[in-house]
Structures are given as C-alpha cells and as structure tokens.
Amino acid sequence: MIQNIIFDMGGVIVDVHREEAIRQFKAIGVADADLLIHASNHRGLFLAFENGDIDSETFRRQLSAHAGKDIPMDDVVKAWKSMISQPPLNKLDFLLELRTTYKLYLLSNNNPILIEWARTSDFSEAGLPITHYFDKLYISYEMKCTKPGRLIFEKMIQDSGINPSETLFIEDGEHNIATAKELGFYLYHAVNGEDWRDAITAILR
C-alpha cells in the first residue's frame, strides 16, 4: 500500500524550457550551452553546481572564465530562471489534497539559484513557497550528490525512514527512473508539461 509520494521538480512540478535556457545562456556568452544543459542531468560546470561542488558565486566566476568574459550575477540568475516556469495551480492544489493522506517529498537535481526562488512566495500564483506543498525537500546540491546515482536515493530513504515498496516515485528522467526501479519504488514516468493528476489518482486507487 502506498504511503509516500516522491516528486521530481523539473519536468514534473514545474515545466522545463531547455531550449529557452540554452538560448539565454548563449546570449550571455556560453557558446556551448547546448552541450552543458540537459533536461534532467546536466554536464560539466552545470553538474558541479547541482552536485553542490561549487556555490553560486563560484559558478558565476567559473562560467565567466568559461565564456571568456565577466558575466554579472543578475544575468546568471535570469538565464537559470528561464529554464522553468511557475507551476500550474491545479497541480499545487492537487499536492495539498494528497498531503491529507500521504507523506509528500521532493527529490530534485537542482541548484541554489532556483531553489532559493522556489522557497519564496514567488514560487506560486498563490503566493506560497514550495515548502508549503511537501513534508520535506531533498535537493542535490544540499546532499552533495545527484540522480541517477544511488547515493542520493539511499540518503533520502535513510533520512525519511520511508520504505520504497510503500512509495510512489514520479519522475521524468529515464535514467533516474531506472535507479528508482532497482531500489523497489512504485514508478510513474512523467512527461514534461503533462497534467498527471488523473494518472496519479488512478495509481493510488
């Protein structure tokens, strides 16, 4: 019986606009942005940022060095924010409904710039931060590891005390789904932009 639900953020809770982010990063001087930015698992400097190996200012400095020009932090923040959009209120309301019955967790490969935004009232049209919708957030840069590696899942399982056999994992990344399957989670493979409410309701019946 399912008692817990884990959601990914990008591509599940919020839509991911990879092509727009690539365009924005190229506009500020990152010519190979298309090689570094991926829908679920970034590469190079972008992966190091999500893995917690570097902080926001170090990312800005290293990105500037990579681009061969100084990139202001405001431009970095704007480029990152172009990757996602505010989540639809109907999804957020659905999360609140689920929380009356299930424990809800977020497991996300993410960086300080986007999570600091998500933890403010700007996250939703309702003026509520992402923390309002989940029992706990598990964020890659804070945990110093990223999906699809097993370690981030194992750390989450140990900290939360959940049993994978009682937990539904909702994710858009194919490789991340594969790791969760190995660990025994119930799975729903979401598609970026999808309204998955009916599908999740059917699974939970």
Predicted region positions:
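Hydrophobic beta-strand scaffold residues
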Residues: L104-L106, L187
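Alpha-helical elements of Rossmann-like donor-binding domains used by nucleotide-donor carbohydrate transfer enzymes
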Residues: E20-R23, G44, T58, Q62, ...
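Generic structural signal for small/hydrophobic residues in well-ordered secondary structure
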Residues: D8-G11, G52, L98, L106, ...
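N-terminal helical cap/lid subdomain that shapes the substrate entry/recognition surface
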Residues: I2-L89, T100, N111-L114
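Asp-based, Mg2+/Mn2+-dependent phosphohydrolase catalytic module
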Residues: M1-Q3, N111-P112, E116-R205
